[in-house]
Every structure is written in structure tokens, then in C-alpha cells.
From Swiss-Prot:
Name of the protein in its database record: Multidrug resistance-like ATP-binding protein MdlB
Compartment(s): Cell membrane
Transmembrane region(s): 26-46, 61-81, 142-162, 165-185, 258-278
Catalytic reactions on record: ATP + H2O + xenobioticSide 1 = ADP + phosphate + xenobioticSide 2
GO (cellular component) term, any one: plasma membrane
An MF annotation (GO) of this entry: ATP binding
Length: 580
């Protein structure tokens, strides 16, 4: 019964998003009411014509002309009002969904990094795009259709009771039956629609995985396997949709049509008990017409029930993201001035049930020193770098920056003073300038100075538009080494107090590595430099080298001191030296 409990809270939250548009919504409902009233008045005119003109065999052409003109005017007004209310509701829907999509994106941007470790990217993309588009139909289709249908039902029933209350009472019995049908539909459709939304997100995730890994897929001839995976996901989505369609086909239009037919038979049965006069023929015509008109909004409401359920399920997925815990930071706005780091009794694991990645790490890094962390894959080097960046909450032990606990420092101060260059740099499909500034106001002179520092100025000068030259998707017109240098330029223009390089030279050629080493040498006097290194040749000049093994510090010292010990570092260095 959980899906029934969640229906109203989610619908209420979705309705709250419409409050800023209340003036336009009121105007749209006025147009909707006017259009519905214009539609309903038509059969009353025809009934009047049959009962008062046709039955009397006295053709008053002037009155007939007036009735015809009024009837045509009512139809024109109905079209006019319905057109403009449709345009207005669509405009409102787009505005609401734009706000909702912005909120979803804001929530995604403030998710803890740990969420991206466990959540497939396709699921996140589906929430931002597909689910918000489904919710759009709630505002531009379900809402207007529902209120238009309710308005029509009320006006039609009022007209029916005005004409003949016996027959109107029979008609009203169809409404509780419709409510029962809608309740049954909601009960059975919600879990099916959840499956549909899940399979859509799963297909998006597999497409994302396939496109991003296309080089590897083609290299290892895995096209057939990935094609079959996507086919399997599509088949599951198809089967889930078919279950919904079968439910729609049974509970929606066909069942309501049957109910309407039963009501019509009741009309005929009741009509047979009265003397058959022309007046009764006019009434019967009006009731048959109204029954057809009544059938349309009832069917519309039940059909919209399917779209409403899809919107509720999509809303459930979206609000689960919006309501999820955000990355927590401290409130201390005091700037980091020296850049010294003190790590005390630090232990860390990604999952509560998992094993420790880091175990009782203790180290002091002086201001403006060059410290390297080395070790085999899985030793905890990158985890330590992520903790220094404040990406994960620290529960066991402490990291102090300028004698302040990292858990107490504000997000703005952390991001301003501690920056990282990663192994796989992110390059935007934008200009050199935009990739360096990232929206921050920085002078052209400063951009050119930092490009000279990272030895990219000659490359940029050779391009037609210089720093305003557009880079390709993910910077595909740059080499990996050039991307890495650009990433370093992006960091240097901000003058961080602490600079972390996480395997920044692991995948580049020796020439680019030398350029990076030269760049780092030029900034050593300005910042605390923390290097996570795979190639030991890149950290020979470090003031201190920390050797990690299975999350523990096993050795500590300068390059010369560690070689003299002939321990774990000595073995690693000689292995790389003689196997290069």
C-alpha cells in the first residue's frame, strides 16, 4: 500500500510548484470555464428548437435565424476560449518544469561525491530530462483536462436536472462507478509505472556507458554483447509498457463506454413509461446528446489517470534526489593563509560495512613544502587526496588546515584555497579562455601569463582566434598532455594555497612530463604542493615522500633517505628503473 500513501504528498508538492503562476492559472481556468459553458449551451438551444418551434409546426424564420446565429457564436466562442486556455496552460507548464528542472540540477550538483560513486550516470540524467518531461504533462495536459472535465460534468448535470430530474438521477450513478474504476487503476498501475521509469533510466544508463566506452567496445569486438544488453533492457521496458497498455485497455475507455451504454438503456427504459410526445422527444434528444458529452470528460479523466500516475512516479524519483542528503561543510569563513596540513589518526572507509582504505595516518606537511604520496594501486593515495579536498566526511581522525579542522571550514574557503589536477582532466567544449576562467572575471593578461607558465602560449597563439578559439567536444583537438597543461593553467590562475596533483603525469609522454615538472618548480615557493605519484622519477625533488601500503604509512623521508633504507620504496624505484 506504500504507493497509495505516497500519492497525495507527491501530488501536493507538484501542485506547490504552480503557486507562483496562480494569476495566469486563474485566467486559464476562467477561459476554460467559459469554453465549457459555451459547449454545453448548444444542446439546450437545439432542445428549445425541437420543443418550441418544430413541435408547433410554426416556422418563425426570424427566431430560427437568431437560434442559428447564437448556436454558431457559441461554437466559435468555445473554440476561441479553448485555444487560448490551451496556449496559456502550456506556457505555465513549461515555466513550472523549467523551475523544477533547475531544482533537480541544483540538487544533483550538491550531491555528496559518494553518491556519484554508487549511482549510474544514466539514472541521474533520466531524472533531469525524462522524468521532468513526464511531469510537464501533469501541468499542460492532466490539470487542464481534469478541471475542464469536472466543469463540463457539473454544467451538464445541472442542465440535465433542469430538463428532467428522473433521468438525471440515473445518469449520476455512473460517477461513483468511475471513481471505483480510477481507484482500482491507481492501485494496479503504480508499481507497473515504477518499473517503466526504472527501465527507461536503465536504457539511458546503458546508452551512456556504450557511447563513452566505444573505443574499448570496438577494440575488443564487444559490439554484439553490448547490443544484446541494450536489446534486453528495451525488451523489459516493452513488456512493462504492454502491461500498462493492457490495464489501460480494460479499465479506461472500454469499461466507461459500457457504463454509458447501460445508462442509455436506462434512459430508453424510463422513457417508455411516459407518454411519447414531441416534448419528450426533445428531452430525450438533449439527454442523449448530454450523455455523449458527459461520456467524453469521464473518459478523459480516466485516461488522464494514466498520465497522472506516470507523473507521480516521476515526481517520486525526482523528489528522492531533491530530498537526498547534501554534501555538508563547515561554517568557518576564515581564509587559509599558510597552507600547512596536519593529519592526525586518520582512518577511512567508503562503506560502513567495508574495510578501511586508510588506517591511522599521521603526518605533518609544512607550509609551501613539496610532499609526495607513493604506493601501489589500492594503497589509498587517491582516497587521501579526496579527503584533503573535503569530498568525503571524516568520521575517524582529523585533518587540520592552518590548525582548523577541515570539517569546520566552509565550502567557499575550501574550493578557493585547495585545488586538484586529476589524472583525467575535464575540458569543456568552449574556448581556451572559458576553460581557464570557468566564469570567473580574469584579465586577458593574466590568462596569457598563466599560459606561458604552462608552456601553452605558442599553441594558443597559433590558433586563429587565440584564447577565444573553440576547443572540440571534451577538448578532442588537444593531446592528453595539452589537456593536462590546460588543467594546470586553470588551477594556477586562482593561486591556491594547496595544490594537489592526483596521478597528473601517469598517462602523458616524457616531454609533457618535463614541462609539468618545470611548471611545478616555478610555483613551489608559492603553494603547498601535494603530489600523488605513480612514476617515482617525478617526485625525486620532493621535500618528503610518504610511502603507503594497504592504507598504512610504511616509510617516510626524502628520496635519498628512502633509497638508503633499501626498503619498500627502494624496491619500487628499482623495479621502475630497470623495467622502463
Amino acid at each position: 500500500m506504500d504507493h497509495l500513501i505516497q500519492f497525495w504528498p507527491i501530488l501536493k508538492r507538484l501542485i506547490i510548484y504552480a503557486i507562483p503562476w496562480k494569476k495566469k492559472i486563474i485566467l486559464a481556468f476562467f477561459l476554460l470555464l467559459s469554453g465549457a459553458t459555451s459547449e454545453v449551451l448548444g444542446p439546450i438551444l437545439i432542445s428549445y428548437f425541437i420543443n418550441n418551434i418544430l413541435s408547433q409546426h410554426q416556422l418563425n424564420f426570424q427566431l430560427i435565424l437568431i437560434i442559428i446565429v447564437i448556436f454558431i457564436m457559441l461554437q466559435i466562442l468555445a473554440v476561441f476560449f479553448n485555444y487560448f486556455q490551451s496556449i496559456l496552460f502550456n506556457k505555465i507548464a513549461v515555466g513550472i518544469v523549467n523551475k523544477l528542472r533547475n531544482d533537480v540540477m541544483k540538487a544533483a550538483l550538491n550531491q555528496p561525491i559518494s553518491e556519484f560513486d554508487s549511482q549510474p550516470i544514466g539514472q541521474m540524467i533520466s531524472k533531469v530530462t525524462n522524468d521532468t518531461e513526464v511531469i510537464k504533462e501533469l501541468y499542460d495536459t492532466v490539470g487542464p483536462t481534469f478541471f475542464r472535465s469536472i466543469t463540463l460534468i457539473i454544467i451538464i448535470l445541472f442542465a440535465m436536472f433542469t430538463l428532467e430530474w428522473h433521468m438525471a438521477i440515473i445518469t449520476i450513478f455512473i460517477i461513483p462507478l468511475v471513481i471505483i474504476v480510477m481507484s482500482i487503476y491507481q492501485y494496479y498501475s503504480t508499481p507497473l509505472l515504477r518499473n517503466v521509469r526504472y527501465y527507461v533510466a536503465n536504457i539511458n544508463n546503458k546508452f551512456n556507458e556504450t557511447i563513452n566506452g566505444m573505443n574499448v567496445i570496438q577494440q575488443f569486438r564487444q559490439q554484439t554483447r553490448f547490443e544484446n544488453n541494450i536489446k534486453e533492457s528495451s525488451e523489459l521496458h516493452y513488456l512493462a509498457r504492454m502491461k500498462i497498455l493492457k490495464l489501460d485497455g480494460f479499465l479506461l475507455r472500454p469499461l466507461l463506454s459500457l457504463l454509458s451504454a447501460l445508462v442509455l438503456c436506462s434512459f430508453m427504459f424510463l422513457f417508455s413509461y411516459f407518454s411519447i410526445g414531441v416534448y419528450e422527444v426533445g428531452v430525450l434528444y438533449a439527454f442523449i446528446t448530454y450523455l455523449g458529452r458527459l461520456n467524453e470528460p469521464l473518459i478523459s479523466i480516466t485516461i488522464q489517470q494514466s498520465i497522472l500516475q506516470q507523473a507521480i512516479v516521476a515526481g517520486e524519483r525526482i523528489f528522492s534526489l531533491i530530498d537526498s542528503p547534501k554534501q555538508k561543510y563547515g561554517n568557518n569563513e576564515e581564509e587559509i593563509k599558510s597552507g600547512k596540513i596536519n593529519i592526525k589518526n586518520l582512518s577511512f572507509k567508503y562503506k560502513e560495512s567495508g574495510e578501511n582504505i586508510l588506517n591511522n595516518i599521521n603526518i605533518y606537511i609544512p607550509s609551501k613544502s613539496f610532499v609526495a604520496f607513493v604506493g601501489q594501486t589500492g594503497s589509498g593515495k587517491s582516497t587521501l587526496a579526496n579527503l584533503l579536498m573535503g569530498y568525503y566526511p571524516i568520521k575517524h581522525g582529523k585533518i587540520y588546515l592552518d590548525d582548523k579542522s577541515i570539517n569546520c571550514i566552509s565550502h567557499d574557503v575550501l574550493r578557493k584555497n585547495i585545488l586538484m589536477v586529476q589524472q583525467d582532466p575535464i575540458v569543456l567544449a568552449d574556448t581556451f579562455s572559458s576553460n581557464i576562467t570557468l566564469g570567473k572575471k580574469i584579465s586577458e593578461e593574466k590568462i596569457w601569463n598563466v599560459l606561458k607558465t604552462v608552456h601553452l602560449s605558442s599553441l594558443v597563439q597559433s590558433m586563429p582566434k587565440g584564447i577565444y578559439s573553440i576547443l572540440g567536444e571534451e577538448g578532442n583537438n588537444l593531446s592528453l598532455g595539452q589537456k593536462q597543461l590546460l588543467a594546470i593553467a586553470r588551477i594556477l590562475v586562482r593561486n591556491p594555497k594547496i595544490l594537489i596533483l592526483d596521478e597528473a603525469t601517469a598517462n602523458i609522454d616524457s616531454g609533457t612530463e618535463k614541462l609539468i615538472q618545470t611548471t611545478l618548480s616555478s610555483i613551489r615557493a608559492k603553494t603547498t604542493l601535494v603530489v600523488i605519484a605513480h612514476r617515482l622519477s617525478t617526485v625525486i625533488e620532493a621535500d618528503m615522500i610518504v610511502v603507503l601500503k594497504k592504507g598504512k604509512i610504511v616509510e617516510l623521508g626524502t628520496h635519498k633517505q628512502l633509497l638508503e633504507k633499501k626498503g619498500f620504496y627502494w624496491k619500487m624505484y628499482n623495479f621502475q628503473l630497470f623495467n622502463c
